[in-house]
Amino acid sequence: MDFSTRMRVYRDAALRKLRRARGLPTDPYPARPEGTYLSPWLDLIASMDDMPRRYALNPADIDDWQTRARAQLAELTGYVAATTPPTIVNVRGPTPLPQSPHIEKTTYYLRVRPQSDLPVTLLVGSTADKPLPVFLYLAGSTSGVHLGWGETKVPIDHQRLSIGADMALQATRRGYLGVCVEQTGYGEKEERYLPKRSADRTIDIALHAALLGQSLLGLKAMDVSASIDWLLSSACPHPIDPKRIFVFGHSSGGTAAQFAAALDPRILGTLASGSVRRLSEIVATRGTSNGELLVPGFFQDFESDDILALIAPRPFVGLSGIDDHIFPFDGVVRAIDGALPAYRSFDAADKIEAVAAPFGHRYYAEESWQAWRRIIDPDFSDDLPRD
């Protein structure tokens, strides 16, 4: 680039920044001619409005519908159940937690696919002497699953822990086996080898997966199922109670929890925090730059209501803050109302509930445990944390 051209570029860039700083328009294009439709978003939203769902909930024949819909969801997401449990390729620990020395933390690196290892961290109390109920923890789109056991790795982690993000540690204190699964794209599973990465941590994975007929949500659900395969195998060092395998997920972890529970009936209770809303409402109100929801053809077959209906009759709680800017509480209510006929078909209408929390998009430990005790695990009765 010659000097005069470079100067023109710098000048126009500086003027553009100045206009932006002063709150002035920066769109260089003229007003769109009257009567024209130039928005790709409006085009796609219009085509979605009247699209019939080929696998919409059919409560009149719920068993047949769940069988067919679960198979179709697996195909759409690229979810494939493993035929054998994963193997341990490395172990880190055990080490006592500084804030809870009677709880040991051990990370197992599980070979879940030929070129994919999954960090699964177990938290176990020293008094564990019988098959343990499982609290499987999926963090949100934050720094990683280490929040589950109360560790900080980046500055903002202190704020997250101050409002109760260490839900797996809290569960372990209450008698569960805490199982912290690192999600694809975050923490130790963040992409570090792709030569030229995009700014968002998961968009490359989502697009590459879509090109292979897979999806980020499918990969996450497969990792959850592989973790359960291992927990139920003889390789797991702690016996578990297969009738009390539960999942807690927040934000992107909550979305993954919903899909995992819809696809894997071994999950016997799910609490999805800050993550329940109809996908059509999400794409109608905001961009999806991380590719988390990229499941090609989803709206031809499903809506979020149907995903929740696949969880029936197993307990489900959708919890959200009344001021959540992504997953507002009224959106939780609509999705759960849409799934309620499935629960009624099983005479289990009391097993699904929308729970409102007082603020915005964040963890809610107290409200989560109240709903957990009431809906997810009636056998949970320990009100006081213990080490």
Which sequence ranges carry the predicted segments?
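Cap/lid segment of the alpha/beta-hydrolase catalytic domain
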Residues: 138-225, 234, 282-284
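Proline/glycine-enriched tight loop/beta-turn segments at coil->beta junctions
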Residues: 115-118, 126-134, 141-144
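N-terminal targeting or regulatory segments adjacent to alpha/beta-hydrolase or S9 domains
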Residues: 1-103, 386-387
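Short beta-strand/loop motif that positions the catalytic acidic residue
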Residues: 311, 318-320
